[in-house]
A protein has these predicted regions:
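Hydrophobic alpha-helical membrane-insertion segments
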Residues: 79-90, 152-170
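Central hydrophobic cores of alpha-helical transmembrane segments in multi-pass inner-membrane proteins
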Residues: 50-66
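Hydrophobic alpha-helical transmembrane segments
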Residues: 116-129, 191-212
């Protein structure tokens, strides 16, 4: 048991975060299940699918991290994992836009319950995105430096907001990149050549919100780390 504890000790923070994310996901699904029992409707079934998609970038980020640490096939493996990660990453914060469904009250369930339900799913999805972005930023930071790491975060925030807009308003899916790449590229170039005011406002506001939220979360993480180190030094 002691040997197992020593092996797990270096990864206790990541294991704790993983356990919390799993717990948040389970609570989300339980809330959805309660709603289906109360209403007899599967109106918000898409939330379960969306939270599943939100886990994919986290898995890809862990894969990229594993290859980066082992330095094995890093030139090929990490870029491939990073590209796949970027394609699926918008699915994590995308759930925030599901809050728009609150504008259409559903009979049989109190509005406050639906508010908490969607917020719980959205919060969980956002945290999944934050953790996966933190892992990817760490890879970029170790390979290219701290400034490059933060430039990567800003670029991802902008691209993710673009992806969320495409998913919410144009109704495209991540897998369209694999099954309809040329068609989607042609359509995208058409939209990009004549951007609407709505698209400019949405992408600008969402990317600003996303980056600010990430930086705030990152700063709180540093504060907690400093406090933990301080407590450890005081106990010695």
């Amino acid at each position: 048991m002691k040997k197992l504890y020593e092996q797990v000790q270096p990864f206790k923070f990541r294991l704790t975060v993983f356990a919390l994310l799993c717990g948040a996901t389970m609570v989300s699904i339980v809330l959805y299940r309660v709603r289906t029992i109360l209403s007899g409707s599967t109106t918000y079934a898409f939330l379960v699918w969306n939270i599943f998609l939100a886990w994919i970038p986290l898995g890809l980020a862990h894969t990229a991290t594993a290859f980066a640490w082992k330095r094995k096939y890093i030139i090929l493996s990490v870029p491939c994992a990073a590209i796949l990660w970027l394609i699926f990453f918008p699915n994590a914060p995308y759930i925030l836009t599901d809050l728009q469904h609150l504008g259409y009250p559903k009979p049989g369930v109190p509005v406050w319950f639906d508010v908490l339900l969607i917020i719980w799913f959205a919060w969980t999805g956002l945290l999944l995105g934050m953790v996966s972005l933190l892992l990817m930023q760490d890879i970029v930071r170790r390979e290219f430096g701290r400034i490059s790491g933060w430039l990567f975060v800003c670029a991802v925030g902008l691209l993710a907001s673009l992806g969320i807009y495409i998913g919410r308003f144009l109704r495209w899916n991540s897998w369209d990149v694999f099954f309809n790449p040329l068609v989607r590229l042609t359509e995208f170039l058409g939209y990009a050549s004549h951007p609407s005011l709505q698209s400019i406002l949405f992408i600008s506001m969402f990317s600003t919100f996303f980056i600010f939220f990430y930086v705030t979360t990152y700063a709180f993480g540093l504060l907690l780390q400093e406090q933990a180190q301080k407590n450890q030094e005081e106990s010695l």
